[in-house]
C-alpha cells in the first residue's frame, strides 16, 4: 500500500476497517439471539482486500 493514497481508496479502507470488528456484547445478549460471531471478519495477513 502506497503512502500517498487517493481519497477513494482511503474511503474504502476506512469502511473495511469499520466492518472488521467483533459483534457487540449487547447483540449477543438479546433474547432469542442466534448471532455468536462476525462471519465476515477479515484478518489482514490471511485475506487481502480486492482494491
UniProtKB/Swiss-Prot annotation:
Keywords: Ribonucleoprotein, Ribosomal protein
Gene3D superfamilies xref list: Ribosomal protein L39e
Single annotated GO MF: structural constituent of ribosome
One BP term from GO: cytoplasmic translation
InterPro entries registered for this protein in UniProt: Ribosomal_eL39 (IPR000077), Ribosomal_eL39_CS (IPR020083), Ribosomal_eL39_dom_sf (IPR023626)
Origin: domain of life: Eukaryota
Tagged with keyword Ribosomal protein: yes
Gene Ontology cellular-component annotations: cytosolic large ribosomal subunit
Family affiliation: Belongs to the eukaryotic ribosomal protein eL39 family.
Entry protein name: Large ribosomal subunit protein eL39
Amino acid at each position: 500500500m502506497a503512502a500517498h493514497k487517493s481519497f477513494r481508496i482511503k474511503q474504502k479502507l476506512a469502511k473495511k476497517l469499520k466492518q472488521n470488528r467483533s459483534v457487540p456484547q449487547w447483540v449477543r445478549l438479546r433474547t432469542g439471539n442466534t448471532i455468536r460471531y462476525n462471519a465476515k471478519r477479515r484478518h489482514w495477513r490471511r485475506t487481502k482486500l480486492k482494491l
